[in-house]
């Protein structure tokens, strides 16, 4: 049996800048690649969990770091023996996890690697929230300076790509500090 890939695509990642490439990849993909589009926050978590339970061998997060977070949370909610491999098509603004993992930012190359590459383990972090829910991450976790930078990026959406994070970092250094 050929592997089945369930590709969870967030059309709002990077403000939809990758929509044309995603359409082309989708049109050329084999029938065992199931494309699922998210429609709301946390939808990727549900889709990933359902894909795992449906027997997908690979669940692909096609989005940014937020989409990866949601997909990982969905995959970690199923038993280890049911858990498929995680794949990535980097469609976000920063694509930090893709960069750290050596995944090409060219979507055609990344898609080709999904079909020819080999799986490798990644570390997953877990936190249990006060309401009892578990959240997972595969990239980084932060509660201080880095969290302020990410919060600032939400107000600077008119800046595109990697410069968004550089400018948000510089503004956070300049305005969110305490002299001791």
Placement of each model-derived feature along the sequence:
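ATP/NTP phosphate-donor binding region
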Residues: 1-59, 69, 73, 108-109
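Catalytic core of DAGKc-family lipid kinases
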Residues: 6, 38, 76-180
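Short beta-strand scaffold positions
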Residues: 61-62, 88
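Polar, low-complexity loop segments and adjacent catalytic/binding residues used for recognizing
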Residues: 65
């Amino acid at each position: 049996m050929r592997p089945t890939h369930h590709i969870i695509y967030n059309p709002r990642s990077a403000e939809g800048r990758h929509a044309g490439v995603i359409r082309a990849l989708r049109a050329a993909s084999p029938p065992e690649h199931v494309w699922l589009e998210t429609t709301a926050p946390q939808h990727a978590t549900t889709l990933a969990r359902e894909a795992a339970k449906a027997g997908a061998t690979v669940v692909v997060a096609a989005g940014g770091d937020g989409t990866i977070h949601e997909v990982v949370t969905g995959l970690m909610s199923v038993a280890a023996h049911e858990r498929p491999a995680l794949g990535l098509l980097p469609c976000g603004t920063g694509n930090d996890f893709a960069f750290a993992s050596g995944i090409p930012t060219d979507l055609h190359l990344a898609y080709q690697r999904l079909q020819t590459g080999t799986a490798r383990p990644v570390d997953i972090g877990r936190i249990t929230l006060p309401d009892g829910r578990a959240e997972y991450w595969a990239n980084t976790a932060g509660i201080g300076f880095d969290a302020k930078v990410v919060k600032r990026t939400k107000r600077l959406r008119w800046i595109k790509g990697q410069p968004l994070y550089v400018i948000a970092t510089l503004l956070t250094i300049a305005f969110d500090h305490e002299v001791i």
